[in-house]
Amino acid sequence: MEKDRGEIFRKEIENLLKGKDIPVKTDQLGNYSIRFKSKTGKKVIAIFAHLDEIGGTVRNIKKNGRLEFSRRGGYEGRWLVSRTVEILNKEGDWIKGVIAGRASHSTPEKLRVSEKFDPLEMEIYLGASNKREVLSDYKIHVGAPIVFSGEFGLLNPKVNNNVIAGYSMDNLTALTCLVVLTQKIAKNLLDDFGCIMSSHDVCIVATAREEIGTEGAFFFAKNNQIDEVIGIDIGIVEDISGSVHSGIKLNKGPVIVWQESFGTGVLDYKLCMNLTKVAELNKMPFQNGVFEFYGSDAGKAQKWLGIPSALIGIPTMFSHNVPEISTLTGIESAAELIFQYLKNFE
């Protein structure tokens, strides 16, 4: 879950900053952060990427041993049937389950074309025969967290060393980008004393609870003096007929997001334009995006706290599904764009 992923993030950052007096800090909501201090500290820029992933929570244990669940984060029921999940039991072990659904062999034609799948009506099969087994043998309780099960890595490593696939690309891609960005800063922008050679401080923040309301980013931004936010998240790649999209391509560079959340999340125009100029000056490919069914840490900081905020998306296909598809070059190019912005920020 978030804490385990946060501790992995901590170790990666600490390895990059060995010998530097730059501690990784945590707060009450589970955010992990470091601060690169400048000599003047005129401004503070925070770079956000979230730790959490979509999942669920056990809502009810039925007499027949199946589990009913509620969602964590936004996703649809239509792709859930036969997906493998893992449930954290009270002893800290992960128990595998499969989301149940009617088999094709027993589904009449009229339901095949018209049936809607509501996650609230779906069940998870564990192998238990009754409720007692779930409680005593599997040691699962109401309130237990659920995550989708899967692996991640190169999709076809023998023929393609760029395209990656797996669960939770939202937001493992952005977290990886945050680590790559930290590496670039540590290697190129720090002096012998560990100060960033800039007029501004930079906070690197792995945020908690984004998928359930961008709570971690809001908490961090509200409790720290932040002058500017750049969020890193996925950029929606979509070309299926009937979908709403901005024509983003998987291999055409990072996405500068101008608007999200049905038009209620408008990112800072000046900051977005500045990122555009940085990309153009450095001859870096980039894309422009507007996302409707989508919200982010950056959008929350902009809307609710009035902090000038921008969002960089790493092109990703099949978002909030398992697996999701992204690229290693997408991660690297997003990190490079933000690095060049920080390097030239005034």
Regions found by a protein language model. Give the residues of each.
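N-terminal hydrophobic/helix-forming segments and targeting peptides
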Residues: 1-346
